[in-house]
């Protein structure tokens, strides 16, 4: 067990203030919140974490069935050894998976003692329904939201807002900031959003998110750090002064990366492209290559002074564990 892991209460055990003393004193201001069932939890906004440290964070997604929830929580539990400053949970595309998003978010807060950033999108819900989701999150002591428009339905290239719903992430941001006290993040795209006509127009939309209350930004995946560094430079020149956290997706297999980069509009550098071809039929070797590639990528980002790193873990712990073992970042490695 690492020193940082001792800051968390035992997985699945009731809240114990003594076990949280170190965590509570580490960063201020932290708010003690009473939630359903007479439980008390400690919460804080991620923007306050960013004022004190350079956070490492992990992103999870809800399973398709309720039976998959324990496996997601177990993966989260295993990664606590690396002392994540927060985790995020993506928003289900609809129906029951949305309730699974809330369930994982609440369980991470209650039983794992990890700060959580809940994803919320404009897809498939009216303003009133989204408001009700926000009220439930607030009642459970969740302090942080990442506000997203959401993707068009599979097979469609155009986003069509739900009747009575929000059309843009900025609309959702404005609603959250006007009605709640959440800390709010927004997404940004170092290589430009797939629907933007050019990088300057894309940056204008990012600036609107910040102007409407985004405390910090988290990037879409990228595999060439030059795109990130260029984006940050352009953002600063454009008056965007909030923290910009790079999002990193380690390669798990060749087909996965090619599929994700097509969907996101991210480019595959020639050197990585050759490696993906080399290991196209060997997932284990591709995964090991991905660990080394991401280790080098994150090391360069960290050494450049990024405010933190957000890992897209895809509900798997192996790759990100090895990456962090390689990097041994201060406060984010297991004891030998």
Q: Where are the predicted features?
A:
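Active-site beta-loop-alpha junctions enriched in small/polar residues
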Residues: 60-63, 90-94, 119-125, 150-151, ...
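Conserved, mostly hydrophobic/aromatic
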Residues: 59, 87, 137, 209, ...
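Active-site mouth loops of central-metabolism enzymes
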Residues: 56-71, 117-128, 185-201, 278-292
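Glycine-rich, positively charged N-terminal anion/phosphate-binding segment
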Residues: 44-46, 69-77, 82, 94-114
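Active-site-adjacent beta->alpha loops and helix N-cap segments on the catalytic face
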Residues: 68-69, 95-107, 126-132, 152-176, ...
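N-terminal amphipathic alpha-helix/helix-capping segment at the start of soluble metabolic enzymes
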Residues: 40-58, 65, 174-175, 332-336
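Active-site pocket-lining/capping segments in soluble small-molecule metabolic enzymes
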Residues: 163-189, 237-291, 296, 326-336
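Short, acidic/polar
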Residues: 67-79, 101, 127-134, 198-208, ...
């Amino acid at each position: 067990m690492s020193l940082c892991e001792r800051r968390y209460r035992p997985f699945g055990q009731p809240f114990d203030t003594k076990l949280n003393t170190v965590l509570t004193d580490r960063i201020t201001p932290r708010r003690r919140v009473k939630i359903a069932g007479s439980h008390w939890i400690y919460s804080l906004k991620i923007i306050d974490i960013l004022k004190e440290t350079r956070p490492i964070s992990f992103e999870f997604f809800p399973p398709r069935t309720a039976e998959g929830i324990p496996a997601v929580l177990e993966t989260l539990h295993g990664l606590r050894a690396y002392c994540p400053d927060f985790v995020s949970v993506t928003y289900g595309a609809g129906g029951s998976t949305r309730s699974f998003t809330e369930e994982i978010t609440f369980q991470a807060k209650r039983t794992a003692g990890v700060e959580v950033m809940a994803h919320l999108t404009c897809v498939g819900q009216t303003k009133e329904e989204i408001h009700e989701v926000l009220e439930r999150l607030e009642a459970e002591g969740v302090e942080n939201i990442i506000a997203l428009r959401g993707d068009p339905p599979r097979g469609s290239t155009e986003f069509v807002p739900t009747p009575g719903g929000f059309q843009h992430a900025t609309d959702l941001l404005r609603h959250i900031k006007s009605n709640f006290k959440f800390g709010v993040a927004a997404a940004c795209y170092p290589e430009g959003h797939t629907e933007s006509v050019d990088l300057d127009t894309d940056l204008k939309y990012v600036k609107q998110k910040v102007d409407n209350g985004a405390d910090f930004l988290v990037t879409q995946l990228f595999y060439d750090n030059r795109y990130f560094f260029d984006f940050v430079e352009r953002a600063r020149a454009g008056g965007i002064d909030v923290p910009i956290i790079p999002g990193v997706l380690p390669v798990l297999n060749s087909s996965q990366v090619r599929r994700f980069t097509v969907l996101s509009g991210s480019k595959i550098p020639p050197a990585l492209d050759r490696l993906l071809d080399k290991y196209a039929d060997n997932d284990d070797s591709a995964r090991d290559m991905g660990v080394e590639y991401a280790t080098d990528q994150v090391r360069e980002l960290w050494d450049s002074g990024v405010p933190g790193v957000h890992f897209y873990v895809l509900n798997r712990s192996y790759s990100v564990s090895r990456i962090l073992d390689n990097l041994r970042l201060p406060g984010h490695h297991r004891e030998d």
